[in-house]
């Protein structure tokens, strides 16, 4: 159930309506235009101080994610210059990396819920324990991922190579994917540990250091990609293996920067004092994080596997679709970071407000951040749609692949405002610890609706991929409607670390 008290639900677009009954029993509606604007402005538009605060949180994340996505784009172009088989092989390997990355995000989210609220409550001892939890769970998940990816790499990669096309091309893609994947495994642990530190720092309100660490990583990745892929500075040309090695080096650099700099500034990040003095995490706190975090971990695992399953289903329409999806997703990610980054602001702002006991402030801020994100997403969607054909020309690949990629980008661009709504709603619901609701809203939606719907389009219709892909994107408007209802209910706005739960969080 999205909300438990219908009487308390106030629609986002409330109107000033006065009803007067005439002699004939007809209702006369008088709507004040100025009243509508006043309510709209109060609900969705903040003052200068609000936007200054929001941008101070969002801009470093936007810079971090934009630079990361831009360098990923350059990597993508470099690998694409080696050939379509190289590009597609790396793409399918990165689908598996995507599942790992998102699973790490989900594993850290449970601790992040409490971390943000402990930061709001200034309880730094238990905040430190949430960081210990993040580090331990990251190591465990990394070990499981390495076990799976070293045990069944061929079987997993082959799932994406079942579409129509030359068997020789399919074999080449598999070979390049295996070369890339085997080296990428060495970068899993540094990535997981750096995400543990960065997420804790962000929960404490520190977004600049994670941004700087990422900037170091992406520029390291860019330089080593150019040198190792093409064999510059006297080094051998390693192709896709060079791309993987560059990524591993960059992830190690990111971890070293964020960890070393943070520990050298413990006067600012005093919650790091005694971090490794013991591995103690309060029993009840561990239980609560697991209760809140396990649904998030399962959610992210199911969501990411659902997304790659949809990609696999679409890829059965032909090998050209694999390369086209990779190009399209690279650019939609680059454009999307501008509004997806608002999710970080929603998580921090609402989490700290809830931790400080101000649920009404948390509710008010979500609507303003969501409206801001939607406006940004709409503008970026128009820009992406206009530039899609030009963008694909930078790739040295077949005309069919470029044409499909442009069509995919235009379809995604139309749905960006809806994605922005769902993204902000996800982080708002998560900030209040409504993890089962988060799971229903996210991964269950993907598996109950999106995957079967995409499968039905591919299997039971005679439509081409040019029609199937836009139709598959209709998942986003429906999810946006669900998101508005969920956020409007206010059921998510809970203080998890206040006086009522304080005893439950201590040993």
Where are these regions (language model features)?
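Transmembrane alpha-helix boundary and packing residues in multipass membrane permease domains
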Residues: 61, 65, 76-77, 94, ...
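Short runs within selected transmembrane alpha-helices of multi-pass transporters and secretion channels
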Residues: 108, 183-203, 210-218, 243-258, ...
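Transmembrane helical elements of multi-pass membrane transporters/channels
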Residues: 56-75, 183, 194, 217, ...
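N-terminal transmembrane alpha-helices
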Residues: 45-77, 81-82, 95-114, 142-146, ...
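Small-residue-rich hydrophobic transmembrane alpha-helices
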Residues: 87-147, 191-210, 322-388, 420-441
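Short alpha-helical transmembrane segments in multi-pass integral membrane proteins
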Residues: 2-58, 115-187, 237-293, 350-415, ...
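Generic alpha-helical transmembrane segments of integral inner-membrane proteins
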Residues: 62, 66, 70, 74, ...
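Helix-terminus/linker motif at the lipid-water interface of multi-pass membrane proteins
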Residues: 66, 70-88, 157-171, 227-238, ...
């Amino acid at each position: 159930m999205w909300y438990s008290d219908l009487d308390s639900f106030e629609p986002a677009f409330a109107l000033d309506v006065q009803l007067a009954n005439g002699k004939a029993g007809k209702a006369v509606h008088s709507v004040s235009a100025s009243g509508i604007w006043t309510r709209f402005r109060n609900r969705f538009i903040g003052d200068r101080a609000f936007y200054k605060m929001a941008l101070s949180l969002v801009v470093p994340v936007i810079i971090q994610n934009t630079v990361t996505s831009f360098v990923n784009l350059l990597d993508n172009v470099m690998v694409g210059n080696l050939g379509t088989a190289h590009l597609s092989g790396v793409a399918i390997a990165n689908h598996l990396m995507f599942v790992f990355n998102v699973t790490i995000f989900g594993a850290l989210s449970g601790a992040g819920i409490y971390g943000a609220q402990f930061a709001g409550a200034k309880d730094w001892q238990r905040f430190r324990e949430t960081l210990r939890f993040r580090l331990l769970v990251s190591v465990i998940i990394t070990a499981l991922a390495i076990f799976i990816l070293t045990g069944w790499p061929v079987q997993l990669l082959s799932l994406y190579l079942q579409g129509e096309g030359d068997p020789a091309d399919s074999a080449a893609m598999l070979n390049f994917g295996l070369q890339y994947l085997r080296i990428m495994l060495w970068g899993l642990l540094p990535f997981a540990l750096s995400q543990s530190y960065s997420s804790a720092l962000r929960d404490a309100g520190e977004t600049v250091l994670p941004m700087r660490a990422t900037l170091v990583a992406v520029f390291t990745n860019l330089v080593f990609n150019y040198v190792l892929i093409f064999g510059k500075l006297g080094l051998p040309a390693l192709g896709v293996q060079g791309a993987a090695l560059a990524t591993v080096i960059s992830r190690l650099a990111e971890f070293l920067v964020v960890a070393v700099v943070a520990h050298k500034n413990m006067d600012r990040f005093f919650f790091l004092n005694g971090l490794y003095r013991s591995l103690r995490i309060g029993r009840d706190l561990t239980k609560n994080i697991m209760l809140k975090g396990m649904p998030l971990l399962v959610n992210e695992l199911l969501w990411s596997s659902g997304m790659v399953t949809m990609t696999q289903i679409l890829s059965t329409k032909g090998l050209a679709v694999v390369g086209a999806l990779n190009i399209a997703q690279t650019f939609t990610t680059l454009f999307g970071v501008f509004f997806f980054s608002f999710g970080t602001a929603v998580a921090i702002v609402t989490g700290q407000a809830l931790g400080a006991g101000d649920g009404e402030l948390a509710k008010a801020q979500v609507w303003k951040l969501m409206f801001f994100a939607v406006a940004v997403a709409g503008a970026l969607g128009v820009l992406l749609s206009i530039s899609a054909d030009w963008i694909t020309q930078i790739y040295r690949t077949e005309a069919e692949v470029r044409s499909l990629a442009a069509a995919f980008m235009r379809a995604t661009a139309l749905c960006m405002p809806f994605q922005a709504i769902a993204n902000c709603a996800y982080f708002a619901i998560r900030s209040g610890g409504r993890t089962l609701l988060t799971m229903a809203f996210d991964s269950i939606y993907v598996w109950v609706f999106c995957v079967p719907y995409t499968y039905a389009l591919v299997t039971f219709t005679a439509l081409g991929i040019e029609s199937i892909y836009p139709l598959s994107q209709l998942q986003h408007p429906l999810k946006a409607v669900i998101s508005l209802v969920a956020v409007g209910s206010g059921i998510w706005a809970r203080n998890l670390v206040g006086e009522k739960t304080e005893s439950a969080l201590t040993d």
